[in-house]
Each structure stands twice: as C-alpha cells, then as structure tokens.
C-alpha cells in the first residue's frame, strides 16, 4: 500500500532519505572546509552538491535544509542563514529545470549566490554599521562569491555529475 500524499513520490521514505543524505553531505563538507566556506572570498566545496538536482528532485529540499543548517552551525547571522538558503533553493530549482543540459544548469548556483550571497556577505560582515555603502567593495564581494561558485560548480561539480550519470538511475529515484 502506498502511504504517500496524493501518491506523490516526493514524500516517499526513500526520497526523504535521499534528500537527507544530500543535506548531510552539504553540511559536513561546509564545516570540514569551514575556513574557505565562509567570508568575503569563499570557495565552498559543498557547493558541488548544488548540481545534485540534475540527478534527483530530492536534492532540491535537501540542499535548502543543508545550506540552512551549515550556515547556522557555521555561525551565520539570521539573514545570512535565511538569504543564503533561499539563494540555494532558487539555484536548485533552476538547476533541476535545466537538468538535461548540465553545463547550463551549473550556472544557476553562480548567478543566485553572486547576486544574493555577495551582498549579504558585504552588508553582514564587511561593511561596518553606519559606514557609507562602497559600491566597488560590494561588487567585489559579489564577484568573489560568484567566482568561487563558478570554480566549484564547473571544476568539481560537473565532473562529479558526469561520473554519477554512469551509475544506475534507480539509485537516485524515490
């Protein structure tokens, strides 16, 4: 008997397990590489996981939860935790949408993190309260976050995805 809501596999035990594993791997990678995972210039190795929606829809909520937990456990302030997780969620949804074209799908984490996380890093951690906004510094933060994301997604993430595509698809199904 199927005990899922509306017979949707999105709520299957296996789907929940897959999403949970994605979240756990994201958290562990972020915290193991903490010195390079946070800050104005970041190279978050865990972002390889942002390409997992290419393989399975269960990665989308898993990445949201994983990013939320990693940012919280990493000591982020509330709007960094919230907005960083939203950036990851938006990127995951778009990555899933373009899953048939992995090189194109890999650009979405770069775009959303550069546009959302870059300003968050600037306003939360770089700019002192009361100081005027420095547009060059803001743009620098956006660029460094985007560049780190681009490097991780294309240099590490795409090879990971192409390797995973050689495995049986049933491994990623709920």
Question: Over which residues does each language-model region extend?
Answer:
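Hydrophobic transmembrane alpha-helices
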Residues: 2-61
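Membrane-embedded alpha-helical hairpins and interfacial helices in multi-pass inner-membrane proteins
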Residues: 35-40, 48, 68-174
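Extracytosolic (periplasmic/ER-lumenal) interhelical loops and adjacent juxtamembrane/interface segments
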Residues: 63-67
